[in-house]
A protein has these predicted regions:
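Short, surface-exposed glycine/acidic/tryptophan-bearing loops
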Residues: 65-66, 71
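Extracytoplasmic/periplasmic ligand-capture domains
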Residues: 1-60, 66, 76-180
């Protein structure tokens, strides 16, 4: 028996509600309603900069993952060498949050499955801790995939996504970037 390993084409990513002005599971720190901060590119960039990808790879995934800056790993057809993961930069993230009008942050729930991807719930918990460092009071709610995906895709009003900030995974069936 010969054992080998290598990167898969599965990428774990965060889906952020950028379209609804009033997004569920996002409030001011006091719990009052606010305009959806995820609509602001500076907030989304701040979130990306607050993620310590090296820590997720080494501690949560115990070295069996690689950082990704796009939806496929290096070496796959259609992957750009110019798209790198954002650095871990909490100081810059805090500045972007302030520039976007959220110097004190806001509250948000991270939703994800707890039985679909390797260490999915642990990744969500690690992300919450990282977001808390830049002023986003993030809580985590995970659930079995049979419940999660239905609610994530059409569990809200008018069959809209029920969640605002979701942990998801994606892999190209053909191993190239244009594959759905």
């Amino acid at each position: 028996v010969q054992l080998s390993s290598g990167p898969s084409n599965r990428v774990i990513y965060l889906n952020m509600d950028q379209f609804r002005e009033n997004s569920p599971h996002i409030t001011a720190k006091d719990g009052s309603p606010i305009k959806n901060p995820l609509m602001d590119v500076r907030v989304r960039k701040a979130i990306s900069l607050s993620i310590n990808r090296d820590a997720i790879v080494s501690r949560v995934m115990e070295g069996i993952a690689v950082k990704a800056g796009q939806l496929l790993p290096a070496g796959c057809h259609g992957v750009s060498d110019n798209m790198k993961p954002d650095p871990y930069a909490t100081k810059m993230a805090k500045k972007l949050m302030a520039d976007a009008g959220y110097p004190d942050g806001f509250k948000m729930t991270i939703h994800g499955p707890n039985d679909r991807y390797i260490n999915d719930a642990k990744i969500a918990e690690a992300l919450a801790q990282m977001l808390n460092r830049v002023g986003i009071d993030a809580s985590v709610e995970t659930m079995p995939k049979a419940v999660y995906f239905k609610r994530a895709s059409r569990g809200g009003p008018n069959k809209s996504p029920e969640f605002s900030f979701m942990l998801l995974g994606w892999g190209a069936g053909s191993g190239e970037a244009s594959s759905p």
